[in-house]
Each structure stands twice: as structure tokens, then as C-alpha cells.
Amino acid sequence: MNFLNFSILIFAYLLGSINSAIIVCYIFRLPSPRSVGSGNPGTTNVLRIGGKVLAAITLIFDILKGLVPVVIAKVLTGNDFITACTALYAILGHIFPIFFGFKGGKGVATLIGTLFGFSWILGLIFVITWLCVAIITRYSSLSALVATVIASFSVIFTSDLQVAAPFLIIAIIILVKHKGNIQRLISGQESKIGDKAKAKNDSN
């Protein structure tokens, strides 16, 4: 691995480690998302704490954290494997941020950014899958999980297995981070879209 590739991966991880939920709440003098609600520093908890506008800001930044480094890797290296690894490092930064004690969000919004950066088709697959599952089931968490798996595995059909591997790892990590959501889905206790927010049901 040359210095450029190494630098891009480190940049992706460090950018991913900037937790927008925590920063947005700090700037607007709101309680830390790590100490209220679900305790998850992600968009859903910011929505609960600060409302739709601040949640939208958080969501946009989380998406950009995945999009920007992947686009940079794609343009500067022209190497699909390095670009896919860059996506993985951005997700690792978001979920295990060095700046916040390695305790971050669940990675779904950042994954959306990496998918669109890698291939707009993959990003579109994620969005369409999410919408279809959400309309049918009204479960935001289930929509995110199904979209994550389908979009990540779709890389296999557009690239070789080496390039797909980082995205498959991402899917596994995100599934593990949603273990609580999966348990509630199985037990029928997961909240649906439009239900009154429940502190433990964050999907992002």
C-alpha cells in the first residue's frame, strides 16, 4: 500500500470519527445524545432531543462523512478495492470514533454516503429498498437492515469478491450494532414509523 492510499484510509476514519450528533447538540446547547434518550449518538436521538431541523443537519453530515472520502479515493486512486476499503474505514470511524471513546452511532447514514460515492446505482438500491420495506412494514430499523444487506451484497454483482468484501464486512458490523433492534423486531416490541418515539428503538 502506498502513502496516498494509506493517507486516504486514515482521512476516511478520522472524518468518520467526527460525530455530528454530539457536535450539533453541543453547538445548540442541548443535552448530549449519549446521556439522554437511547444514548445512541445518531440522527434518531437528535430528532428526539432537538427536532427535525437539527436531525436533518446531523443526517446530512453523516451522509457526507461517507460520500466525501469515497469520492476522493475514487478520483485519486481509480482503484475500486481501495475505494471500497475507504468506505469501510469511514464506517469504522462513525461506529468506533477515536475522538469519542470509540462509542459512536450505528452507521446507516454514513453507509448511504459511501454507497452513492462508490456507485449511484448502489445508493439508489439502498433508498428504493428502504422505502419499499418501510411502506410495507412501517419499521424504520427493519428497512435499514434489509437495505443494508441488499445494497452491500449487490456489490458482488457489479465487482469482484475482493472489492465486495469491505461492503460485506460493513453489513455484518451494522447488523451486529442493531442487535437490540433485531431482538425487539422478533419480540414485536420495536416501534413503527409514526409511533411515539421510544428511547431504545433507534435505528441510526
Swiss-Prot record:
The keyword Ubl conjugation does not apply. Keywords: Cell inner membrane, Cell membrane, Lipid biosynthesis, Lipid metabolism, Membrane, Phospholipid biosynthesis, Phospholipid metabolism, Transferase, Transmembrane, Transmembrane helix. GO terms for cellular component: plasma membrane. Pathway: Lipid metabolism; phospholipid metabolism. GO terms for biological process: phospholipid biosynthetic process. Its EC number is 2.3.1.275. Pfam families: G3P_acyltransf. The keyword Cell inner membrane applies. It is a multi-pass membrane protein. Probably interacts with PlsX. This is Glycerol-3-phosphate acyltransferase. The gene is plsY.
